[in-house]
Amino acid sequence: MQRYQLGRIRPSSRYAAQFPDQVPVDITRLPTLDALFALVQRAGNRQVRFDIETKLSPLAPADTATPEVLARALISAIREAGLATRCTVQSFDWRTLQIVQREAPEIRTAYLTAQQRWLDNVSPLATAPDAPSPWTAGFNLRQHGSVPRLVHAAGGRIWSAHFADLDARNLQEAHALGLQVLAWTVNEPTQIQRLLDLGVDGLISDRPDLVRAEMARRGLPLPRATPVDAAPPADTQAPPAPPRP
């Protein structure tokens, strides 16, 4: 995968049309997780958190490692870097989240959901209406009645929902259950404003510049910037992560 450059969107693609303001960073390769951890540690910012998504599908098991292999490799990398308290593992495939909760309870998990026409990972399949969705690790939406209650039943503390699925009712229900609520992927100013007005606990966005601008307009505290091109003073540098076996 490191043969591919990630620093520039293919100009003729529809994706490029969605992000005309993207600033290219040529000769950018896909980093390993270890390399990403080391990069942020070199910047000296101890507040940066890592939101790591496991990418696998119960509908295409041959395409990736098993949930067990993937989750355990991720747990190992996080622990070796000493960053367990600064990492959250999120996934649409809740099997990996269940493994992380059992085997690394110090690492937070976030339950990704969507109930859209183009993606629905919580509703039963039309071919098996009484069975749980293959994505939800055996937890059945029909038995629990709502997505917030489904996430809560799975042991989740963070519900990360598609922004269009969130409204005042289910946000209030989630908060009453003790869940934090994140919205993804929020890129338009009107969407950002609506969700901040609604009272979500966090936003996932491809446009952090727009999110920060709206937060600043509202007088909300902004996360500290993390330049990574200048090394911090020697006494603030974190040691590099140990080599992986």
Describe each PLM feature range:
Residues 1-108, 115-116, 130-143, 152-162, ...:
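Metal-dependent phosphodiesterase/phospholipase catalytic core, i.e.
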Residues 111-112, 119-245:
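C-terminal active-site rim and adjoining tail of enzyme catalytic domains
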